[in-house]
UniProtKB/Swiss-Prot annotation:
Belongs to the purine/pyrimidine phosphoribosyltransferase family. PyrE subfamily. Its EC number is 2.4.2.10. It comes from the Eukaryota. PROSITE patterns: PUR_PYR_PR_TRANSFER (PS00103). HAMAP family: PyrE. Catalyzes the transfer of a ribosyl phosphate group from 5-phosphoribose 1-diphosphate to orotate, leading to the formation of orotidine monophosphate (OMP). Gene3D superfamilies: 3.40.50.2020. Homodimer. PANTHER family: OROTATE PHOSPHORIBOSYLTRANSFERASE 1-RELATED. This is Orotate phosphoribosyltransferase. It catalyses: orotidine 5'-phosphate + diphosphate = orotate + 5-phospho-alpha-D-ribose 1-diphosphate. InterPro entries: OPRT, Or_phspho_trans_dom, PRibTrfase_dom, PRTase-like.
Length: 236
């Protein structure tokens, strides 16, 4: 990737890995919202050992930065089913590798879509959430539904949710209830921050992607992505 980007080295490395691995693609993609996006991010493609190490490393650096700058403290890394499951385990291992003095005792947990009624039972797998500070990790926040479900499950256990870290913040406003996308509006991340009062961090934002694109992408892809940001950027 060219050196014109102002992104920190680990963000540049993550962005390049996402593009080279087919995780981040440019073109024309219809989203669940029916919007036509010029880019698409699918963290499920981080399935090779090399790419899994890259995403775990980028998450770990983002989390440690959040600890240093925002005082983020946690005992458990929680991954909502399904994409959050491999993320939480890989991230926990990486945190123990890069900061063993502080994070070697961090555990991970994830949820089942349906509660198990035999064996150990319940819908939480991994470390018990009882009395623990919980950090949620996932790929993106689109409508926020999965994160609300995770927060409610954690709260139901009577535990402390301390924050959320995602791979990508699309910085995109939620679809308007009346279908009029010309109206300004908040993002799903902004609404979650407001509703639950918890910090949310991202490895990359759409602004980061556009900054990084200038080192390698075609002028058409850059313009399409900038136009999409201008049309759908959230107010928060």
């Amino acid at each position: 990737m060219a050196t014109t980007s102002q992104l920190p080295a680990y963000k540049q490395d993550f962005l390049k890995s996402a593009i080279d691995g087919g995780v981040l693609k440019f073109g024309s993609f219809e989203l669940k919202s029916k919007r036509i996006s010029p880019y698409f991010f699918n963290a499920g493609e981080f399935h090779t050992a090399r790419l899994a190490r890259r995403i775990a490393s980028a998450f770990a650096k983002t989390i440690i930065e959040a600890q240093e700058k925002a005082g983020l403290e946690f005992d458990i890394v929680f991954g909502p089913a399904y994409k959050g499951i491999p993320l939480c385990s890989a991230i926990t291992i990486k945190l123990g590798d890069v900061a063993p003095q502080n994070l070697d005792r961090v555990s991970y947990s994830f949820d089942r879509k349906e509660a198990k009624d035999h064996g150990e039972g319940g819908n939480i797998v991994g470390a018990s959430l009882k009395g623990k500070r919980v950090l949620i990790v996932d790929d993106v926040i689109t409508a926020g539904t999965a994160k609300r479900d995770a927060i409610e499950k954690i709260t139901k256990e009577g535990r402390h949710r301390r924050g959320i870290v995602v791979a990508l913040d699309r910085m995109e406003k939620l679809p308007a209830a009346d279908g009029d996308d010309s109206k300004p509006g908040p993002s799903a991340i902004g609404e979650l921050r407001k509703e639950y009062g918890i910090p949310i961090f991202a490895i990359l934002t759409l602004d980061d992607i556009i900054d990084g694109m200038k080192g390698f992408a075609t002028p058409e892809d850059i313009k399409n992505t900038e136009d999409y940001r201008a049309k759908y950027k959230a107010t928060d």
